[in-house]
């Protein structure tokens, strides 16, 4: 039986922090036909508010170190300030949006990341996404807006990479829908030269990705984004793209193969 289609859009923290760009993205998001779901980051907002509170932000390989103080900050910022701002803006555009963290309805459960070379602190690696509950919401006309917070089922909130939330959610929904996953951020796509917007890599497969990682072309925060993109394709997500926040139709971005 043919499945219905759904578009999962993940919007990055740089766009979330810029009110005019976020407004334009939400305009375009609302124009997407059919079922849709939004996952947001908010790292820049968290860093900014942490600094105002005198809390240092530490990153390793594009991933945030989340100690107890930073966990309180990201919970406030991701689950509150950023999420509810997006929900309110979607409501103003006629979207029946519902803000969620992974703890709400037990939608995303995770475990605290094991300490290996780096202790990331209160960071969660996803165990399960309840695609059935999300599908029930979506079929009732709700547009879920998911913050990058999960829980371990023992009363603990964990900070989880938003790209991972998007990928794992897309994978879970692929049991019910034909899923298109779009990573929307401040650049036109994956660039061969980070200073040249004209150097976008139009198609990227795993072999090319590994080559670009080895020679340093792809590094930092792009690494987890692409690792999650390839995991989604492998798990049955139909289409994955990385593109500029103004290009949700993916006319100019990078397609993952």
Locations of regions flagged by a protein language model:
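C-terminal catalytic "cap/lid" subdomain
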Residues: 1-257
């Amino acid at each position: 039986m043919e499945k219905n289609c759904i578009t999962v859009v993940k919007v990055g923290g740089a766009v979330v922090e810029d009110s005019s760009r976020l407004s334009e993205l939400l305009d375009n998001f609302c124009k997407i036909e059919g079922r849709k779901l939004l996952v947001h980051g908010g790292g820049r907002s968290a860093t900014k508010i942490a600094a105002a509170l005198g809390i240092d932000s530490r990153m390793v390989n594009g991933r945030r170190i989340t100690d107890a103080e930073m966990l309180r900050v990201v919970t406030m910022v991701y689950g509150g300030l950023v999420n509810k701002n997006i929900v309110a803006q979607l409501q103003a555009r006629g979207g029946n949006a519902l803000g969620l963290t992974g703890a709400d309805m037990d939608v995303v459960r995770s475990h605290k990341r094991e300490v290996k070379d780096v202790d990331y602190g209160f960071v969660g690696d996803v165990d399960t996404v309840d695609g059935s509950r999300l599908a029930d919401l979506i079929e009732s006309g709700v547009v879920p807006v998911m913050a990058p917070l999960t829980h371990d089922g023992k009363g603990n909130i964990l900070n989880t990479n938003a790209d991972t939330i998007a990928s794992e959610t897309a994978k879970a929904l692929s049991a019910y829908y034909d899923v298109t996953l779009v990573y929307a951020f401040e650049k036109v796509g994956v660039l061969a030269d980070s200073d040249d917007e004209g150097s976008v890599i139009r198609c990227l497969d795993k072999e090319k990705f590994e080559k670009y990682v080895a020679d340093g072309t792809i590094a930092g925060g792009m690494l987890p984004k692409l690792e999650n993109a390839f995991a989604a394709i492998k798990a049955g997500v139909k289409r994955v793209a990385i593109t500029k926040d103004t290009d949700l139709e993916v006319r100019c971005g990078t397609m993952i193969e």
